[in-house]
Amino acid sequence: MNMLLVIAVNTILSLILITVAFWLPQLNIYTEKANPYECGFDPMSSARLPFSMKFFLVAITFLLFDLEIALLLPIPWAIQTPHINMVLPTALILLTILALGLAYEWLQKGLEWTE
């Protein structure tokens, strides 16, 4: 009962906040807010330079494998618990998913910087 109440309250509160954010847009938009700020000077060139999509993909891959380390780091302490039958299969499933993701990234040549 408490779980359903928490889910219902969170859902209703989220819907109210989304509705308020949608129906009350910011009305004082003017061009100075849309321009980049460079120490009080007018920008010499465009501040919105395009970036390399390859760099973006490598950065996302790095973040995913950094998250892997954060998830696998507590495993030596978790092995000492009496619930080892739950810890090891979960860790192996996580490692398998990440290894398959790495293999897919490698086969798609996402890790090669030069082409």
UniProtKB/Swiss-Prot annotation:
Key words, A-Z: Electron transport, Membrane, Mitochondrion, Mitochondrion inner membrane, NAD, Respiratory chain, Translocase, Transmembrane, Transmembrane helix, Transport, Ubiquinone
Record field: transmembrane: 4-24, 55-75, 84-104
Bilayer topology annotation: Multi-pass membrane protein
Chief localisation class: mitochondrion
Catalysis performed (reactions): a ubiquinone + NADH + 5 H(+)(in) = a ubiquinol + NAD(+) + 4 H(+)(out)
Subcellular location: Mitochondrion inner membrane
Gene Ontology CC annotation, any one: NADH dehydrogenase complex
InterPro entries: NADH_UbQ/plastoQ_OxRdtase_su3, NDAH_ubi_oxred_su3_sf
Family: Belongs to the complex I subunit 3 family.
PANTHER family per record: NADH-UBIQUINONE OXIDOREDUCTASE CHAIN 3
Protein name: NADH-ubiquinone oxidoreductase chain 3
